[in-house]
Amino acid sequence: MGLRGRSTWCEVACSRRNSAIPSDQRLLFGGDRVGSIILAIAAQHEFAAEVPLNPTPIALPVSIVFVALLILALSIRRIRSVGRLPHRKWRRVTEWLVLSLVTLVCAAATLTTTYNMIAQRYYQSIYKAPGKLYEVGGYRMHLYCTGEGSPTLVLEAGWTVPALGWGTVQPELSKTTKVCSYDRAGYGWSEPQPGPRDADQIATQLHALLQQAGVTGPIILMGHSMGGLYIRDYASHYPENLVGLIFVDAITPVQPGQLSPELRADLYEIPTYEYYIFSMTYGLGIPRVMGECSKVYAGFEEHTERMLAESVCNSLLGEIWKEYKGWWQSFDETIHTGPYGNLPILIFSRDPQKHSGAGAPSRLELEESVVWNQMQEDLKKFSTRNRRIIFRGSGHEIPLERADLLNKEVLVFVRQIRNEAPQPTDYGSTKTE
């Protein structure tokens, strides 16, 4: 999810920029409600299959354990010799205290990292993919299709979010038509793939995946946040059999001069050191030890055990980072996409009046809200058959915050494409519901 695009990477961990960042990025920290309930949603709908989650790379945690044990051994050895050193008492005591602290820290790091590795492997081995795996470019990709009927609704999630992020949407929509969600490379049950993670590459891989699975059309694409950028790219390269587009608070390419330097930095520029901090934090198992990987939220108490397998705490941060590094390339690839003639387009947007936090919105947050609202309005230029709906009271996470209204409007959209419902008489409109 991302402009809102900065994904939700920093909303929790970088609270100094908390006001303007969307929820995809919150998923990188296990404490966010969105990330924490993804596996609970999966459990609720009894997802099950034969394929375990991607194994989390062990190079980092193994390295942490090795270094911690080495320092631990050297510290203990030094502690044993401190009392025999010809130093003043205060110096010996100080050195002993410092070495003892180092020993405790290294011992704790070894224990938490080892515990985290074991927990990851255990939960990744017992929770299976809900859908099927298909080979795309020599690597396995996960596609989960439910329901029957035409057209097929293909779901593209936001940044950092696996297919299970559509858990509040897919079960309901699949009662009416065929619905397919999938894991991008390196997410969920899909294997990581070499090469860039920009819009062209992601759209190409999605098209190949659908071809492999025999999902050839007619197709409606629905993309949330950063996923909206990817379905634009797909529509430009593979318009055949495409019968509709649905943008769910979708990101649009940034136009030159559209953002102030301060807002641009706040939304799109993630310092590299933050990635390394996140990697080290997760490698040490700190979120798991603090309970962030097993938080129980109201309404999901019965799924506590399955929530322990939450994909956020087991995510491939390297793949997520690669996708972030491809943002500006993705903007360049999609800035001139469209228009799409009379292709039916539905645009869902968050409430511009909804701001994070209890206090008055900051100047930067107000600026972001104005720019974001205009970007949403600009999506109407893609087709003469467009409608925009602002979800009153909803933030960026529309599929979770207003799943009821989203499902209702999408089902009407599907029936209109089937010619089973009257065609809209308010094309070009923007309304709030």
What are the functions of these language-model segments?
Residues 144, 184-222, 238:
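Active-site loop/oxyanion-hole signature of alpha/beta-hydrolase fold enzymes
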